């Protein structure tokens, strides 16, 4: 049994048996309490060119972080019950270590969906781009040394109707290799004053655009 190099295949049964579902590189999937597939995946096959980060919990406000594990490229994982119920996973490129999931929300009145485009550029890493109205976009980060180092990330937002940039600055992301949780630091001196962020789960951040100046 195999899977395409850029995919992960999850199974409802142990030993890669039962109904299965495939997910592509760049996908982050989370199940909430009560969702049909929450805690249901029991085994998986990871493609040769991707890794898969898996979590017991996805809520940032869970009293304890829960279990976290990274599944290696090309691995067959016959029993995932050690995670105590799979609630979230990321399929990331094999040469990266972790990922941040980001989206922009336009809080400016009377603007059509897609009016603002956010570009995030982590130091030394290809940029990711998303527009208001889009779902979360995965931003993979390579192995840092030490592993819990901060990575500075440029933040820029432009008006897609005029091409004018309405926000520009930077922030810092940090990864905890023991829990898989990501945190953000936004220095007053560098973070755009017309924006704020909300952490939506253990790796996901909503960037709110509150004004154009």
From Swiss-Prot:
GO terms for biological process: calcium-dependent cell-cell adhesion via plasma membrane cell adhesion molecules. Coiled coil: none annotated. It is found in: Cell membrane. It comes from the Eukaryota. GO terms for cellular component: cell-cell junction; external side of plasma membrane. The keyword Calcium applies. Keywords: Calcium, Cell adhesion, Cell membrane, Membrane. One of its GO terms (molecular function) is calcium ion binding. InterPro entries: Ca_cell_adhesion_N_dom, CAD_C_sf, Dictyostelium_CAD, G_crystallin-like, Membrane-bd. The keyword Glycoprotein does not apply. Mediates calcium-dependent cell-cell adhesion during the early stage of development. Belongs to the Dictyostelium CAD family. This is Putative calcium-dependent cell adhesion molecule 3. It comes from Dictyostelium discoideum. The gene is cad3.
